[in-house]
Amino acid sequence: MKKILCCILSLFCFVQILYSQQKEYKAYLVATAHFDTQWNWDVRESIDDYLHRTMVQNFWLFERFPNYIFNFESAQKYAWMKEYYPHEYELVKKYIKAGRWNVVGSAWEATDPNIPSSESFFRNVLLGQEFYKKEFGVKSNDIYLPDCFGFGYTLPTIAAHCGLIGFSTQKLQWRKNPYFGEKEKMPFKIGLWQGLDGARIMAVLDAGGYGTSYYYDDISINRRILERAKLGPDNTAYSYYGVGDRGGSPTLPSVYSLEKSLKADGPLEIISAKAGQIYEDYYPFEKHPELPVYDGELLMDVHGVGCYTSQAAMKHFNRRNEHLADAAERASVVAETLGGLEYPSD
């Protein structure tokens, strides 16, 4: 009897060792529902249909899948929830507190990072973070731009000076040509992006498609994610999954696949992740020399880049308004200093 028990225990230990050895790769799975506030529809349709759908579909998934975490950006959309759907908004707050619904992106609205001035970008983040802190008692730690058309050299510097530590996108994979004569479309999959002043943030440059879905799959053996993990630091990948443009939620089969894969025995350790978890896991970055560093801009060569030259009038008036806003603020500070009107801080 003792021999039988010893054999069983030995076999169990062997299986455990084998299982742990298999987990040499890691994948952060980030559930999302990219939501263009206004594209081929107006704001009213966004509020009446897409915003409401985003809330109720995710509520349904939360109640059925205990490890599911949803990531959603833009303080503007949360402000609409509060105004138009107060009951559902209270549920969103409950799920945020429980760690199931995660606010990401830091900004009032996901913005083009090339045309606006640095001051505009700072204000966008300031407004978003103040709203998140006031309404939910939390702040985001990242720049979350899955669907923008290139990223300027100032972005890591702005992010770092806003107290943010990470950035993610899936757009660079759309590039047609290799990056600046290199073999790949981007400098790295996951690494550190250095800005003009030497400030660095962690950057995920290939997060997969935000519309990625799974159909009752074992994601721990997913070949595409595994290949990305092999190219990442510490055999690590970061992967969006969900839907795009009109909000909503990941599909039911996708979330089922996630739950199933968390305890599966494939070579990938699957993590149901908040968008910024990977940055926190690697912070402080100085302790991780395995992270490659890129110093420069990250531009697109296809898709929406034509709008930067074709919309000259829009660029002109945007910059004019930025200058007028700056002048108005400076004048307000002078007026208050000289004993005139009180500075309109609201």
Language-model region placement:
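Bacterial Sec-dependent N-terminal signal peptides
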Residues: 1-22
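Catalytic-domain carbohydrate-binding cleft regions of carbohydrate-active enzymes
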Residues: 21-346
